[in-house]
Amino acid sequence: MQVIRLEALSDNYIFLLYDDKRNIAAVVDPAEAQPVLKKLAELKADLVAIFNTHHHNDHVGGNKQLIEKFPQLIVYGGAEDRGRIPGQKVFLQQGDRVEFADRIAEVIFVPGHTRAHIAYYFPPQEASETGDLFCGDTLFSGGCGRLFEGTPTQMVDSLSKLRSLPDNTRIWCAHEYTLKNLQFALTVDGDNADLQRRFNEVKAYRSRGEATIPSLLGVEKHTNPFLRWDQASLQSTVKSSDGVQTFARIREMKNNF
């Protein structure tokens, strides 16, 4: 399975999953249809599935046009998003599985950004390979999504699920927010040498117009403050010994950054 990153809107990424054996594709969170249709035409491939992580328009905006072009495709989304995702036919819950290109993705229920948010995790097929996590707006490179419908407790639980995955998991999040996220991270975790190094690397990438997605989960664990709510240095910064409260205070600081 090949993952093809497509740019959309101002800072969105759409991920096209391509099965070159069968010349078919699936797409994760099509913010708009045109970039997907253009790449499918180049590949001369059929689209068989849409994997939506949540209902926000910058993740489902292309659904209707893609369904019109490929009426047999199947739209997957979270069970609690029923009625909110255009064309949804499959309603997924924690622990469900979906198959594409001889790989099986595990569905992880990750409420917080929205009440129905899910992520798709494709474990590696071989020990030497990477897994692939399509996490929408739950976990970002260097950050996490705002809490529009969920609570800090829910988000910490959701991020705990993602944090437990292997370090070599590739993080395919839906926005190019890394540089600004790390600028904020330095304000709450400025003595973190790993974070300082990463910020300089990302700054160089973006100066060359290069994407920072995918990230690796192992890197996130050491540099993303929203996965480090139980670290003493961050708890000291926000003056709390409680993990959820630490997360909530950091999230509020980021909202106002």
Swiss-Prot record:
NCBIfam families: GSH_gloB
EC number(s) stated in the UniProt entry for this protein: 3.1.2.6
GO biological process terms held by the UniProt record: methylglyoxal catabolic process to D-lactate via S-lactoyl-glutathione
Primary gene name: gloB
Family assignment from sequence similarity: Belongs to the metallo-beta-lactamase superfamily. Glyoxalase II family.
Stated role: Thiolesterase that catalyzes the hydrolysis of S-D-lactoyl-glutathione to form glutathione and D-lactic acid.
Signal peptide limits: none
Enzymatic class: hydrolase
Residues binding Zn(2+) 1, per UniProt: H54, H56, H113, D137
Pathway: Secondary metabolite metabolism; methylglyoxal degradation; (R)-lactate from methylglyoxal: step 2/2
UniProt name for this protein: Hydroxyacylglutathione hydrolase
Cofactor note: Binds 2 Zn(2+) ions per subunit.
